[in-house]
Amino acid sequence: MQQLKISQMKGMIIRSFSIACMALSALSSSAQKNPFITDIYTADPSAHVWSDGRLYVYASHDIAPPRGCDLMDQYHVFSTDDMVNWKDHGEILRASQVPWGRKDGGFMWAPDCVFRKGTYYFYFPHPSGDEWNKTWKIGVATSNSPAEGFKVQGFLPDLEPMIDPCVFIDEDGLAYFYYGGGGVCKGGKLMDNMMEIDGTMQPMEGLVDFHEATWVHKRDGVYYLSYSDNNDKDGKHNQMRYATSDSPLGPWTYRGIYMDPTDSYTNHGSIVEYKGQWYSFYHNSALSHHDWLRSICVDKLFYNSDGTIQKVVQTK
């Protein structure tokens, strides 16, 4: 009888242990992990929520083996409906498909995408000549689908050679374009064709230590412009800063740093709300430990009662 009880107790312990292991496994598989894309190297995540209820991320692609930022090519799109399981929709555009692009390709840097009046507009920087830093153009590709079928339509004319396009569509339907780099950030209103500036680009006043990576979002009637700075201390680099305004083109009031440096030489982020939770997207070098083989990440973002942003906690 005693042996039977011992045997029953052992069985109960084994079953309990098995159930606990299964629960831990389920919890692990349902948890967000960073980086969330691990089969290729990705950077510069531009996150958007479209009408199908999914969150899409448009990312640049670091190609291995690394040779600086000049090899970046072949934009990819990823999507999710639960912030855990991600679908790679594959490549949507490469340098060889850009008619006016530099003959040696590469240099497909941080992109953005918006949806307006039935069309997805994909904006990307790419040089048109051998002197790449003097010949940047902001290309535009369009599609009827968020993750396939993009065709290059041309580029925005009469712009300075800058990078990091960002397009923001306000609640009234008006579209605004921003770009920058090297300490300069400018913005302007887009025409209805989404391929020309209505008027002139103007400097975004009030930003502190702007470097690049402009992103604009709106919350509770307040416009937020976030960007990377020029931090270079103790082996740490770009911090992410932000400013606010009651107008999409400023002037802006500087608010502070919302993300500390990652382990990468650069950072480039986006901020978006999905299913009632705000998220901060960014990249690091956690997979490769190499500055030019980066990986996109996401963490929750929280606001204080006064609308300021709490410092984002970077997770693994």
Residue ranges and their predicted role:
Residues 30-316:
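Carbohydrate-active catalytic/glycan-binding domains of CAZyme proteins
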Residues 1-32:
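Bacterial Sec-dependent N-terminal signal peptides
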